[in-house]
Amino acid sequence: MTAWRTLATQVLNGTPLSSSQALDVVHADDDEVLALLDAAFRVRRHHHGRRVRIHVLQNAKSGVCPEDCAFCSQSLKFDSDPEQYGMQQVDQIVEGAKAAWDKGAVTYCIVTATRGPHSSEVDVVCEATRRIKETYPMDVCASLGLLDAKQARKLADAGVDRYNHNLETSCDHFGNVVTTHEWSDRVETVKQAKAAGMEACCGGIIGLGEARADWVDLALALREIGVESVPVNFLNPRSGTPLEDVDTVRPQDCLKALAMFRLVHPEADLRMAGGREVVLDQMQPLALYAANSFFTDGYLTTGGQGESKDYRMIQQAGFEPVIVEDGPERQTPATADDTPSGDPEAADRRRQPSAGPAG
């Protein structure tokens, strides 16, 4: 199938992409990648223009998760030796918000490594959110694991705008990656967040040993739930995890996946997330033709390429960062690359404890 622009027209006219059409996209020949991105960009430009939304993550509780997600070095079940610390204090989380604001973030994401939050941890996030909202006109996203209805309402009432809980992969493939909880548990948490009035941030990871059909199944499941934000991560294997020796997905195929996610989710905040620097490498700018958002300043257990290089990438590709004009004066992002080699491992070595996860 080569008439990719007809798919964009179909989507813009209000007819959702079908499963078979989505499969055609992810199975396209490499020669078709630019044509696919052109189709995805028509949809992206219609809903988001050339704007790019910057998100920053705060790893508020690290390395102490009891779950066995095979991709994650923060699990206590693996010999991955992550940095470990308990729940940060309110002041630390608010300080992280200031740093995110100075980096130009429009969304600040508070993340904990856990199955689900204790009531005291929910209280910390709620108080931090209230204080952040008093000063910084940023959206606040929380990612605290599995939620019940009471916890979801409490977070929403405190001003949390969006809740992140990724499905990670298709329902069929999930059991090959996680055994300590069910895919349906994650779906229920996302539904609880939406029922409480928060937007749903929910996506997955490319490269968990799944088939391309699993990418499509995940995208369609997210559409059925009605998520507003879709982070797409790319597995950057972590030492000591069961997936440490898995080959990364080719960048061409990652771009096909992003194009498919954009066509399935035309209005969503589509984010190229963890692993982009390593897996997409020099093809990152092309991803902006489908995605309208990304994280800067690192992830869960890996550093990024530096916000200076990220901003330069946006500008050189002909896009523009979304900047919130109101609020306190912020530091202008530096223009010089603060990781001279552009090496993500070098960024790892200089990563601060507040550097956060993908999601």
UniProtKB/Swiss-Prot annotation:
EC number of this enzyme: 2.8.1.6
Domain of life, per lineage: Bacteria
Species for this entry: Salinibacter ruber (strain DSM 13855 / M31)
Cofactor(s), by name: [4Fe-4S] cluster; [2Fe-2S] cluster
Alphabetic keyword roster: 2Fe-2S, 4Fe-4S, Biotin biosynthesis, Iron, Iron-sulfur, Metal-binding, S-adenosyl-L-methionine, Transferase
SMART domains: BATS, Elp3
Pathway: Cofactor biosynthesis; biotin biosynthesis; biotin from 7,8-diaminononanoate: step 2/2
General function of this protein: Catalyzes the conversion of dethiobiotin (DTB) to biotin by the insertion of a sulfur atom into dethiobiotin via a radical-based mechanism.
Protein name: Biotin synthase
Entry binding sites for [2Fe-2S] cluster: C109, C141, C201, R271
Quaternary assembly: Homodimer.
Enzyme class: transferase
Higher taxonomy: Bacteria, Pseudomonadati, Rhodothermota, Rhodothermia, Rhodothermales
Boundaries of every Radical SAM core domain copy: 47-276
Binding site for [4Fe-4S] cluster: C65, C69, C72
